[in-house]
């Protein structure tokens, strides 16, 4: 399957080939047996996106299962799953292509749930609606704000959604919903998502599922893959919408909390995720 070549090099070739096609279907596959909880993907993502406190697009959770003495641990990366039927988009009062958020189905961004920071009103409904807790609101914090001067690396430009953003107090993307976007700005330039390129164990596969010759397609065909189930029901979401009124971005993010222990994997999910898993 790999022909003695590095998987990362093959993935980059797959991405460049996909960019020459009229439409793509981006997806990610995570091989849980390979994950060693090094957090290289998380650190790489934070550095790439200039992420502030409270915003982590690529968390990796250490999850314990079973009852002593039959206890097992699993390391589970949990980015935005880029659902084909995303509850976060459905919950947005300003949804639609080019508006606050939408599921892209065409062009280079096909397969990615997009956010337009300039249109997002920061209401928090999408944050609460996501059953995977993959979204958070930018509360405007800085790691070095209590020092004499906010350090330059925290206000350095980022290129999310292929636009230049300089993060400052009370300026976009402050107050907006934020999440993983498969490093769309890197994809447009034929580059591999940062979490994929920084993984020391090569636990991630990424590419175009429409391309049956792509590495991700071949690995998925050769293995039994699963998707992650959500952790909340619609009833709880509706109740929490009312509780959002008057809340600050930081308060809303605290309402989201931890995505839950003992994640449930299944053959399919109602949200139709674009991130797949090979279980240990």
Predicted regions and their residues:
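Non-ligating segments of multi-cofactor redox enzymes
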Residues: 1-280
